[in-house]
Amino acid sequence: MSRRRWGVAALAVGALSASLASAPANADVETNGHHGYSKTRTVGYFIQWGVYDRNFRVKNLVDSGAAARLTHLNYAFGFLDEAGKCVSADPWADWQMPHTAEQSVSGKADEAGQVLLGNLNQLKQLKAKYPKLKVNISLGGWTGSRYFSNAALTAESRAAHVKSCTDMWIKGDLPGLPAGAAKGVFDGIDLDWEWPSSPGNPTPPNVIRPEDKQNFTLLLAEYRKQMGWNRDLTAFLPADPAQIDRGFEVRKVFSYLTFGTLQGYDYHGAWDPEANQQSALRVPKGDPAQFEFSSEVTVDAWLSRGAPRSKAVLGVPFYGRGWDGVAPGKRNGLFGTGVPAPAKYEAGYEDFHRIKAKLSEPGNSYKIYRDERAGFAWIYDGKTWWTYDDATEMKRKARYINSRRLGGAMVWSLDGDTPQGELIKALDGALK
């Protein structure tokens, strides 16, 4: 299931109680050239549940060449309990699942009696192989943001939340294991509260309060108070300008963040009746949607509200969205009505490598189309319509990031690429 949907159609369009801890002048702790980086950031999400149906493991990042190209790897997701404290969404995948020699980054099988197993042990091995790579734990996500409002509610709840999360993920104190068993796996924390002041995922919806907007800022301040300024503190941030205004004090938020990743996808999807772009750089001409969304709309919205260019990292998708039963119309299916297209994991949602494979299936009649002005691609066979970003579009996105002097690119999610790393190579190779 996609954990990045944001349900535009479902969204309806106070002073801080305590002084905020002042950020040092050098608040961006990993500017270009620092920690060995010579260009903008390349951030990628590794999904915890990918080890199951997708059989995508940390070792695949080595085999595809992705690990060598990333500056940051975000591990998705850790969850929050009702009290707002950190918990694992899946301890088996996180630290209990044994790996064979073939599945392991080190090439050695996990041993009987070994304390740390699972994805976290593989991430530890990955860091040993790529010591400049920063690995952060991502908290929340589309299905894991329900209790962020509880965590951020009071000074006491914020302090308890941050302590629980840093104890668990930074100090490595995992339930049932010796203290510090996972110390050194994670360098920092990525907050994926989707979204402050928004119900988000409808099943079940987030707890929301009018003060979520201000409390998110205070939560970031508490993270800096407890973690200091030498660790990454990042956040995944929405594409919708209305949601930005509902949930974020932009200048204050970015004063605490190392950088923020801007949602550059899910502009349209299965919740819309018309086949439409989901990650275009610009709004295509003739777009019939009620609201206009694009990467340019999102970037402009954040920058105009005070986000620093150097800290604004644009998200790009390694997946596509599709509709079935779409008539050709005048634009090769674009804006035609349809229903979510059949797919492997979720109707209307398909990994890039699976969409690419459709082009080489025997007897297929798919053709590739591009809107060069708006900056997006789709394939269409007269009935089924998929929009996605291929290597050509990744290079286009990288050129856009360069031209806007943004802080880099973020990928959701790395498992969607081909085994050869086609997309990450195209994206990273074109970033400056």
Task: Specify the residue positions occupied by each region the protein language model found.
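Extracellular low-complexity, Gly/Ser/Thr-rich intrinsically disordered linkers
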Residues: 51, 356-432
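Active-site groove signature of glycoside hydrolases
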Residues: 169-210, 266
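Secretory targeting and sorting signals
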Residues: 1-27
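An active-site-proximal structural segment forming one wall of the substrate-binding cleft
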Residues: 154-189, 219-227, 245-259
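Glycan-recognition patch characteristic of GH18 chitinases/ENGases
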Residues: 29-175
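Conserved, mostly hydrophobic/aromatic
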Residues: 73, 137, 191, 260, ...
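Substrate-binding surface in catalytic domains of secreted glycosidases
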Residues: 85-107, 196-352
